[in-house]
Amino acid sequence: WVVAAGALVLYLATLHSWISFASLPAVSHVGGCQDLPQTKQPLLYLFTLPLKLLPASALPFAMNGLAAVFGALTLALLVRSVALLPHDRTKEQRQREQSEHSLLSIGLNWMPPLFAALICGLQLSFWQHSTSGTGEILNLLLFAYVIRCLLEYRLDDKPSWLIRATVVFAISIPNNWGMIGFLPLFGVALLWTGRMRLFREGLWLKLLFTGIAGLSLYLLLPLVAVMTGSGYSFTEVLTDNLGDQKSFLSNLFSNR
């Protein structure tokens, strides 16, 4: 939390003063300046829903401030995740590190998390999205939380960590097409982390149902469009988001 507080102060001090080119689409949707209904990033829509109550002049600053909070929380999760990394991958590590769960126990064990936070937090793209309300930093925050949950499960074997990871990953997919590409890796990570316990205790059913529930976020913006009388049908709004995600993924793999 010390790192998160320091990062928040830094990002607030260097906050974008107004609307950037990258944040224009998100800010215009929140401010109601778009003629078309919002069809993408349903999770960002939920987080920014209270900001619609603000006057238009305060909206850009509020969006940028929210991005700074997301950026600071992402670094806090990064610090925790690095601290949880096991140090028993090689024979030499197993000989030197005798602590429980093979966590780094030397006097300078605070340096790797701090170094990771500095490298990530001061990286130009990360800094830009943490000081401008583009909405991209929310995607990274969710990704960081999923990794943290998988690492926490290794310590206490509580199934709730795997359930949290599944829920957050599932709600990330409608908001970010990139998470679809990570889905096979996430499945492998769940199997590797949970091992046979997933099948002995019926945990896989809980993960399946919570994942499906998270994916229902795809339906949020189509419902909003219909309820607000935007003139667009439920199917049109839904297929616009799904079509864009399919297009991004197709272009990604076709260019390799």
Where are these regions (language model features)?
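Start-transfer (signal-anchor) and selected internal transmembrane alpha helices
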Residues: 1-10, 73-76, 102-114, 205-213
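Short acidic/glycine- and proline-prone juxtamembrane loop motifs at membrane-interface regions
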Residues: 22, 125-138
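Transmembrane-helix motifs of polytopic, lipid-linked glycan transferases
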Residues: 65-102, 117, 142-152
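Transmembrane-lumen/periplasm boundary regions of multi-pass, lipid-linked membrane glycan transferases
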Residues: 136, 180, 189-256
